[in-house]
């Protein structure tokens, strides 16, 4: 990743990878480090949610933060998403910068009024007088064997709403840099993590370990350069896309993989530049197909000069249009894989 230094602040640029892989870091540790650094940096920042303090969080994302920063900065709440989300929004109105953790974004539906009607609308309805600097974060999408009510992907839901920023990290670099940017942002940010990615380790450069490392919201990253097809994805879909790119390389297909990182604002320019080079486009997401992120990409392609650059129709790889089954074999059948991505690319390129 190319970087520029603004004063003491390291800011990640659009494309590429870290300058040097100094070590590895899990997504869990990256999120923990980001919150630790921002709580220390700004005394207006605090974390609240179910079991985030003494228990260290349901997924141990906040491990050690309560002991280090105390119960005014890391706050356990009752099991009432509507209640503690409302408290968090009110705190943001008052000038604090809360991080509101949902144990799973499936439960954010209990707090949807606070997110959509209070957090997302207040800056507009106050004519810019009342900013709402809040981060709603937690695991989103399919996990492992948690069935229909705990496996939903809300990316497209929240990206549909003006007034929100929506971020979907893939790697440890994404997780740390984007969460720090979200906490510093004066707008409400929905920060959609993935439970399966929490324990995965990624190489990180020296700059990622800096207290001042941030990744700009709204800028995609070219995870892998290629010439024959553009594969666009986010969150765990990037994993499938990169694995597919490796398989395609073995048959002589050079795939460019774009990690969107942010869904709103949306970096369509990176897609445009890539398709002008490859002339083929495949989108990958784990959520449902109807009105999904791939659908929005397709619409923007149709409405721009990118459409004239395509040598084949855009193809979408998505989850299956059903509630998530509980049975392991059926759950696997409901989610996209690298093989699905390879199949879509071959269809786009008209190769066997």
Swiss-Prot record:
Sites where the protein binds K(+): 134, 182-183, 185, 187
Q: Is Mitochondrion found in the keyword set?
A: yes
Subcellular location per UniProt equals: Mitochondrion matrix
Q: Name one Pfam family in it.
A: Transketolase_C
Which SUPFAM superfamilies does the record associate with it? Thiamin diphosphate-binding fold (THDP-binding), TK C-terminal domain-like
Please state what class of enzyme this protein is: oxidoreductase
User: What InterPro entries does the entry give?
Assistant: PDHB_mito-type (IPR027110), THDP-binding (IPR029061), Transketo_C/PFOR_II (IPR009014), Transketolase-like_Pyr-bd (IPR005475), Transketolase_C (IPR033248)
Cofactor(s) demanded: thiamine diphosphate
Coarsely, its chief localization is mitochondrion
Binding positions for thiamine diphosphate? 81
**UniProt entry keywords in alphabetical sequence:** Metal-binding, Mitochondrion, Oxidoreductase, Potassium, Pyruvate, Thiamine pyrophosphate, Transit peptide
Q: Which GO terms describe its molecular function?
A: metal ion binding; pyruvate dehydrogenase (acetyl-transferring) activity
Recorded catalytic reaction(s): these are: N(6)-[(R)-lipoyl]-L-lysyl-[protein] + pyruvate + H(+) = N(6)-[(R)-S(8)-acetyldihydrolipoyl]-L-lysyl-[protein] + CO2
Q: How does it assemble?
A: Tetramer of 2 alpha and 2 beta subunits.
- Function in brief: The pyruvate dehydrogenase complex catalyzes the overall conversion of pyruvate to acetyl-CoA and CO(2). It contains multiple copies of three enzymatic components: pyruvate dehydrogenase (E1), dihydrolipoamide acetyltransferase (E2) and lipoamide dehydrogenase (E3).
- Stated name of the protein: Pyruvate dehydrogenase E1 component subunit beta, mitochondrial
**Species for this entry:** Caenorhabditis elegans
The uppermost taxa in this organism's lineage are: Eukaryota, Metazoa, Ecdysozoa, Nematoda, Chromadorea
């Amino acid at each position: 990743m190319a970087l520029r230094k603004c004063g003491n602040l390291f800011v990640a640029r659009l494309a590429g990878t870290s300058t040097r892989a100094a070590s590895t870091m899990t997504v869990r540790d990256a999120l923990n480090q980001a919150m630790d650094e921002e709580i220390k940096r700004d005394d207006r920042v605090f974390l609240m949610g179910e079991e985030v303090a003494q228990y260290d969080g349901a997924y141990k994302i906040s491990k050690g933060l309560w002991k280090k920063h105390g119960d005014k900065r890391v706050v356990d709440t009752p099991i009432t998403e509507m209640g503690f989300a409302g408290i968090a929004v009110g705190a943001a109105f008052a000038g604090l910068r809360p991080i509101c953790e949902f144990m799973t974004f499936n439960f954010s539906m209990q707090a949807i009024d606070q997110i959509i009607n209070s957090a997302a609308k207040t800056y507009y309805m106050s004519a810019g007088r009342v900013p709402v600097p809040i981060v709603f974060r937690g695991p989103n999408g399919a996990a492992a064997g948690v069935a229909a009510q705990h496996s939903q992907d809300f990316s497209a839901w929240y990206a549909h709403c003006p007034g929100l920023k929506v971020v979907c990290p893939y790697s440890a670099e994404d997780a740390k840099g984007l969460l720090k940017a979200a906490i510093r942002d004066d707008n409400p940010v929905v920060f959609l993590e993935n439970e399966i990615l929490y324990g995965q380790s990624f190489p990180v450069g020296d700059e990622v370990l800096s207290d001042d490392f941030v990744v700009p919201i709204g800028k995609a990253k070219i995870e892998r350069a290629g010439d024959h097809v553009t594969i666009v994805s986010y969150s765990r879909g990037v994993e499938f896309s990169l694995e597919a790119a490796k398989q395609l390389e073995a048959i002589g297909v050079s795939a460019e993989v774009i990690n969107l990182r942010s869904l709103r604002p949306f970096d369509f320019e990176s897609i445009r530049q890539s398709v002008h080079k490859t002339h083929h486009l495949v989108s990958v997401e784990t959520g449902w197909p109807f009105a999904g992120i791939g659908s929005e990409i397709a619409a923007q392609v149709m409405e721009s000069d990118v459409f004239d650059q395509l040598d084949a129709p855009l193809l979408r790889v998505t989850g299956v249009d059903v509630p998530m089954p509980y049975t392991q074999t059926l759950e696997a059948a409901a989610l996209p894989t690298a093989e699905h991505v390879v199949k879509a690319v071959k269809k786009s390129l008209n190769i066997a």
